[in-house]
Amino acid sequence: VVGPDQLTAKPAAMPWTVAGGFSAAAQTADIGLKEIKAGAGDTVLIHGAAGAVGTIGVQLCRLWGATVIGGAREAQHEYVRSLGATPFAYGEGFIGRVRELAPQGVDACMDGIGGKALDAALELVPDRNRVLTLVDHGRAAELGIRTTPLARSAERLATLAQLYAQGDLHLPILATFPLDRAADAQRAYQAGNIRGKIVITID
């Protein structure tokens, strides 16, 4: 539940299933990328590029003129390419694969995975002020990197919703589950191979 200062009109073309997941994913991506000053000419690494936040993050970076390298499972690579990023697979040697894709270096990273992926970001990005984690908050202060501040607003959401209405952003819905199948939704999420958003609906 949010206050009226967090609300904006839903674009007519946006389905309610998308609207239910759009605000959190889009605002998190926008806030995170602006924290690391992602912009024109940058090479941006996004860990978890096929998830909801990563999906929006790739598209925003492309709109701003950045090149994106996106980490994802191999089954998600075609999807990540369709968003405008160059995908790479995790696993042994993935830091080397990123370096091959970005021979001039990586300027910034938004991490949606944590753990070894975050460790790799610290090795790949020279400036820790341009590394942000969405998940490993406990290590952020220790490592001297960024996390997303509480900066959601109606104004930010309205701007992002307008980009959706213009066709500049989209958020695919992988699956919907009724509330009484919330456990199934969680299992689907934990199974991986996510492309976009899983939404719980309430009749």
Where does each model-flagged region fall?
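Terminal helix/beta-alpha structural elements that buttress the NAD(P)+-binding lobe
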Residues: V1-D203
